[in-house]
Amino acid sequence: MLAIHSLSSTPCSSGLTSPPKSTLLTKSSFHGLRLPSVNLSSSLRLRVQTPPSSVVVMVKKEDELKELRTKTNEQLNEEILQLKGELFMLRLQRSARENFKPSDFGRMRKRVARMLTVKREREIEQGVGKRLSRKLDKAWKRSIVVRPPPSLKKLQEKATAEAEAEKA
């Protein structure tokens, strides 16, 4: 009987009752996420400072592009080969765990990309289509004579100079 009485629908003082919603909100210690206030003047200063630095970088790129556009296709091809050789040397240094700057990879790749872009712009001006351009590019790559990059030549010269110094 006791069990029946406790299950009855009449509310008792010891029974579970839920307080009204308004009291739940006021008694809660959690009032959402508190984000640190952002000083608008400092964020505006940061925004004002960034464009001039990026503008300077763009000017450097524009200067480099102007310089690249003055070169002939043969000069561009030579420089592309040299940079690709340097990239190969950087990869070798990385695999041998020697000292190298990781930023040099991106820098060299971007320079090669700029040179190839200038080369392609010239082809477009001449009316060369994509398909013919790829065909010409393949032919150019096949005609390349493999030779060591300038940095490797310098290392070889140092090694021969040291060998001669040891003999003397």
Curated annotation (Swiss-Prot):
Keyword line: Chloroplast, Plastid, Ribonucleoprotein, Ribosomal protein, Transit peptide
Pfam families: Ribosomal_L29
Compartmental location: Plastid, Chloroplast
Predominant place of localization: plastid
InterPro entries given in the database record: Ribosomal_protein_uL29 (IPR050063), Ribosomal_uL29 (IPR001854), Ribosomal_uL29_sf (IPR036049)
Domain of life: Eukaryota
Residue segments, region Disordered: 1-20
Record bears the keyword Ribonucleoprotein: yes
One of the record's GO cellular component terms: ribosome
Transit peptide interval: 1-58
GO biological process terms, semicolon-separated: translation
GO MF entry, a single one: structural constituent of ribosome
Protein task: Component of the chloroplast ribosome (chloro-ribosome), a dedicated translation machinery responsible for the synthesis of chloroplast genome-encoded proteins, including proteins of the transcription and translation machinery and components of the photosynthetic apparatus.
Family: Belongs to the universal ribosomal protein uL29 family.
Assembly and oligomerization: Component of the chloroplast large ribosomal subunit (LSU). Mature 70S chloroplast ribosomes of higher plants consist of a small (30S) and a large (50S) subunit. The 30S small subunit contains 1 molecule of ribosomal RNA (16S rRNA) and 24 different proteins. The 50S large subunit contains 3 rRNA molecules (23S, 5S and 4.5S rRNA) and 33 different proteins.
Matching HAMAP family: Ribosomal_uL29
NCBIfam families, per the entry: L29
Name under which the protein is recorded: Large ribosomal subunit protein uL29c
Organism from which the protein derives: Spinacia oleracea
GN (gene name): RPL29
